Design a protein with these regions (language model features):
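Acidic, metal/ion-coordinating pockets
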Residues: 11-390
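Bacterial N-terminal signal peptides
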Residues: 1-7
């Protein structure tokens, strides 16, 4: 490694300024039976107050220690949380209880992407209310705002002396209520796509203006040492990214993105290391898959006969990032460790007691060694994810 640095960056040995760990999770889909699971696990005290965030803590308790020990934990918030209900919940129109946000906070999440196709499911009012509820729980929602300036604003987290910046963007919406730059807004990459658009059921697709996006990235990178971009993109249920995105991602990395976190397909796609022309190291995750949902319920709790059910496979993407300073004052980035932690959404496929929750493969196997065949089958289904940990 040092020899490579000297080749790229000169002859002086770089000085380590700091290192940190980010853990990233994929799509949170609070379907009806996810809510039912939480209600059945809710613990209420004598005053009628929930003691475990409406039961949502139970859903996340196995992965919480991983998130809590990270310096920064990220997830895609794929549902508004507005108690006032501006649209009925039906089909692909979502709304989650605010207790769900409490559970995300308790589990250890810090940064939530709210730039996705469900941002306006509860209209503009629901978007604004969700932002407030997130802030009330000492987390930050990125990619959506009370104005377009707020939606596009970089969120900066300080880790020791390192400035870590976050941006979030989506190239599709189910409902678009972006009406003016000074009203509620979701960060979009360009105008509405009019022809040769990527099909994804009923979503509205947006053209990616590469020049404008790269300009935004360059502006953001000048303010931080490490830049993390959340991008809601792709086609649902495809395990291979479109060529559109495999061509775009390296360009975005070259212009300043250090970690690119993709989501929307609801299944895993490749996670790859990337090295910029100046020697900086980075990571591209084309899709983090689902963090949890009610998808794929028909396969039972622990299927051993199929690699299907990929909407229930996911990862906690653990990335160690180190920032060095050179003799000339420049800062350089390495990825000393990339460890995707495999997870599985348990689902009893029962209307009365669905028991939906996120579980690490290692926990499933520890609790019952006879589930080894199941774990091996799931790892086979995600074999294209490089460097899977236990």
């Amino acid at each position: 490694m040092l020899a490579m640095w000297l080749c790229f960056w000169g002859h002086a040995e770089p000085t380590l300024l700091s290192s940190f760990q980010i853990v990233a999770a994929g799509d949170t889909l609070v379907h009806r039976r996810v809510k039912k699971t939480a209600r059945t696990k809710n613990i209420i005290n004598e005053n009628g107050v929930t003691q475990n965030n409406g039961g949502f803590d139970w859903i996340l308790e196995d992965v919480a220690p991983i998130l809590q020990q990270a310096d920064i934990a990220f997830v895609n918030l794929e549902s508004p949380t507005d108690p006032d209900f501006h649209r009925p919940i039906r089909g692909e129109v979502f709304n989650a209880p605010v207790d769900f946000l409490g559970a995300l906070s308790t589990a250890g999440f810090d940064v939530l992407s709210f730039a996705n196709n469900h941002s306006y499911d509860q209209k503009s009012e629901g978007l604004v209310r969700t932002l407030a509820e997130v802030e009330n729980r000492e987390m930050t929602a990125i990619g959506a705002g009370r104005s377009c300036a707020e939606a596009k604003k970089i969120h900066i987290v300080k880790v020791d002396a390192i400035r870590v910046g976050f941006l979030a963007i989506t190239d599709l919406l189910n409902i678009n209520e972006n009406t003016d730059v000074d009203t509620p807004c979701v960060y979009l990459p360009g105008p509405k796509c009019q022809k040769n658009c990527t099909p994804d059921r009923d979503a509205i697709w947006y053209h990616i203006d590469e020049n404008a996006l790269i300009s935004d990235i360059q502006t953001a990178k000048r303010q931080v040492d490490v830049l993390i971009l959340s991008f809601h993109w792709g086609i649902e249920y495809r395990t291979k990214p479109l060529s559109l995105y495999t061509a775009l991602a390296p360009k975005l990395m070259e212009h300043g993105v250090d970690v690119l976190l993709g989501h929307h397909p609801h299944v895993l796609q490749p996670v790859v290391r990337h090295t910029r022309s100046n020697g900086d190291e980075g990571v591209i995750a084309y899709s983090l898959g689902n963090f949890f949902s009610d998808m794929g319920k028909k396969y039972g709790m622990y299927p051993t006969s199929t690699t299907r059910g990929k909407t229930r496979d996911g990862i906690l993407l653990s990335i160690d990032i180190a920032v060095y300073q050179l003799e000339n004052g420049q800062r350089k980035i390495t990825i000393p460790k990339l460890a995707p932690i495999p997870i599985w959404t348990e689902n009893a496929n029962s209307n009365d007691n669905p028991q939906i929750r996120v579980r690490r493969h290692s926990t499933i196997l520890k609790e019952d060694p006879s589930r080894k065949a199941f774990v091996e089958k799931r790892r086979q289904a995600m074999s294209f994810i490089e460097g899977l940990s236990d």
